[in-house]
Amino acid sequence: GDCLPHLKLCKENKDCCSKKCKRRGTNIEKRCR
């Protein structure tokens, strides 16, 4: 699945983010921020 033009795809969880997809602290999985 692709994301809308103004959204970015978080490859780790295939989620569409309005912001960056990045890790939080010691968490391994990336999340929409």
UniProtKB/Swiss-Prot annotation:
GO molecular function, one term: toxin activity
Record note on what altering D2A does: Biotinylated maurocalcin: 3-fold increase of stimulation of [3H]ryanodine binding to RYR1, and no change in cell-penetrating properties
Localization annotation: Secreted
Region of interest (Essential for stimulation of [3H]ryanodine binding to RYR), residue spans: 22-24
Result, substituting K20A: 5-fold decrease of stimulation of [3H]ryanodine binding to RYR1. Biotinylated MCa: 3-fold decrease of stimulation of [3H]ryanodine binding to RYR1, and important decrease in cell-penetrating properties (PC(50)=1350 nM)
Consequence the record notes for mutating R23A: 13-fold decrease of stimulation of [3H]ryanodine binding to RYR1, but loss of induction of calcium release from sarcoplasmic vesicles. Biotinylated MCa: 9-fold decrease of stimulation of [3H]ryanodine binding to RYR1
Impact reported for L9A: Biotinylated MCa: 2-fold increase of stimulation of [3H]ryanodine binding to RYR1, and no change in cell-penetrating properties
Changes after translation: The non-natural D-maurocalcin (a chiral analog of maurocalcin composed of D-amino acids) completely loses the ability to stimulate [3H]ryanodine binding and calcium release. Its protease resistance, combined with its efficient cell penetration at concentrations devoid of cell toxicity, suggests that it should be an excellent vector for in vivo applications.
Effect of D15A: Biotinylated MCa: 3.7-fold increase of stimulation of [3H]ryanodine binding to RYR1, and no change in cell-penetrating properties
Listed result of changing K8A: 16-fold decrease of stimulation of [3H]ryanodine binding to RYR1. Biotinylated MCa: 3-fold decrease of stimulation of [3H]ryanodine binding to RYR1, and no change in cell-penetrating properties
Keyword Secreted among UniProt keywords: yes
Gene Ontology cellular-component annotations: extracellular region
Keywords from the UniProt entry: Calcium channel impairing toxin, Disulfide bond, Ion channel impairing toxin, Knottin, Neurotoxin, Ryanodine-sensitive calcium-release channel impairing toxin, Secreted, Toxin
Cited SUPFAM superfamilies: omega toxin-like
Residue numbers marked as site, Essential for stimulation of [3H]ryanodine binding to RYR1: R31, R33
Domain of life of the native organism: Eukaryota
Resulting phenotype, H6A: Biotinylated MCa: No significant change in stimulation of [3H]ryanodine binding to RYR1, and important increase in cell-penetrating properties
Matches recorded under Pfam families: Toxin_27
Record note on what altering E12A does: Biotinylated MCa: 4.8-fold increase of stimulation of [3H]ryanodine binding to RYR1, and very important increase in cell-penetrating properties (PC(50)=113 nM)
Record-annotated disulphide pairs: C3-C17, C10-C21, C16-C32
Expression by tissue: Expressed by the venom gland.
Function according to Swiss-Prot or TrEMBL: This toxin stabilizes ryanodine receptor 1 (RyR1) opening in a long-lasting subconductance state (48%-60% of the full conductance state). Furthermore, it triggers calcium release from sarcoplasmic vesicles (6.6 nM are enough to induce a sharp release, and 60% of the total calcium is released after toxin (100 nM) addition) probably by acting as a cell-penetrating peptide (CPP). In addition, it has been shown to dose-dependently stimulate ryanodine binding to RyR1 (EC(50)=12.5-26.4 nM).
Family statement drawn from the similarity comment of this UniProt entry: Belongs to the scorpion calcin family.
Domain comment in the entry: The presence of a 'disulfide through disulfide knot' structurally defines this protein as a knottin.
Protein name per the record: Maurocalcin
